[in-house]
């Protein structure tokens, strides 16, 4: 009886969901015509550098990387954004503690009995 080794299939077909997102093996055709030599430092002819932009056919092929998030922007606790979307909960359990949402706050920020009181609904004269 053979023992399964790490990285080997135990048979039975595909066990991952890759078949939903990857093309069939017979559909994959290697394209070796677009390979280029990466070791040279020569600039291709016809390239014009304008500031940070390159004007040529190869400029269309370059991929622009997204700017990485600043540490402040990626962490809402130290972010300069308003703190209206950070709530502290006092419940005991797995979902207790700091709750961060992107919704605006609906918390009433007035003193009890103050201008946000619903006394006018119940006949209070002061409201």
Curated annotation (Swiss-Prot):
Residues 76-98 have a biased composition (Polar residues). Keywords: Microtubule. GO terms for biological process: cortical microtubule organization. The keyword rRNA processing does not apply. Signal peptide: none annotated. Belongs to the SPIRAL1 family. GO terms for cellular component: cortical microtubule, transverse to long axis. Acts in maintaining the cortical microtubules organization essential for anisotropic cell growth. It comes from the Eukaryota. PANTHER family: PROTEIN SPIRAL1-LIKE 4, SPR1. This is Protein SPIRAL1-like 4. InterPro entries: SPR1/2/3/4/5. Residues 1-100 are annotated as: Disordered.
